[in-house]
Amino acid sequence: MQPFFKFIRNMLTNIVLLLVGTALVLWGADKFTDGACGVARRWNVSELVIGLTIVAMGTSLPELIVSLFSSIRGSGDMSVGNIVGSNIFNTLVIIGASAMAMKIAVSRITLYRDISLSFGVAVVLFLMGRDGELSRVEGILLLGVFACFLYNLFAAERKNKKNQTEVSEQTKDIEPVWKLLLFLVIGVASLVGGGQLLVNNAAELARFWGVSESVIGLTILAGGTSLPELATSVVAARKGSNDLALGNALGSNIFNITLVLGLCNVISPMRIPLISTTDWAFLIGSNVVLAVCAITRMRLCRIEGFVLLLCYAAYLTLLFV
């Protein structure tokens, strides 16, 4: 009887920790979104720019940490697989779930600059990886793309601010900067910590229930490092912060390929793992599907969200065939 009671105790512990992790992720996403929106209004910066920079970088910390440590240990090929899977998840699941939660308006600048760049860096990674490895020179080139992206982003923002003649009265009612930054830090910590608890204990429960390691890896763990982006984008969409919801996912895509892989290659040139044609096709094609969904009515509704989620379901199905 003791092994049985030990099994039940362990399973209940995993369930409790999973619920705690879920609560931390949701609470962290709420605080992080409030902090990011407040910083945008306080500094008179658009939510799109905040989403593409601070929020995208903050929610991509799991990918950055995993990839950097993999490169330092000489397991760089793990980094590429992590980034490819994460970007497919970002485009299809995060934006799809956000559109299902609330209608998202798509600005022309988001369509023609951000979605196009997300598509472009995916193509660049594919072309760089055709020879089976990424060199330090290619890593430096990726970092250069990221630097150009940031420069153009803030240059366009400065131009927009010069065209504004009035300062919004809303800034008077915003929390002080130190409090907003505290929200950001606490939010990121809760997202990362809660995500770890959720993923680890969900994986343990899956093993208890006899789910195979491959299924755990392709579902729970693959989406695990993208949980912060998912929670933040869905919460932002429900709060009406469309630019923040889209900017977070697209910014993470750009950040993952240019900065994360760029840094990893500078630290340690890596070999590209045997990424299948299906993975490359969905990495690039997911951006095409998103662009088509967005350009038809310049907004993403439940229909478009369902299409994106359906594409991810098709991707998972193909992985098992």
Predicted stretch roles:
Residues 2-321:
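Hydrophobic alpha-helical segments, chiefly the membrane-spanning helices
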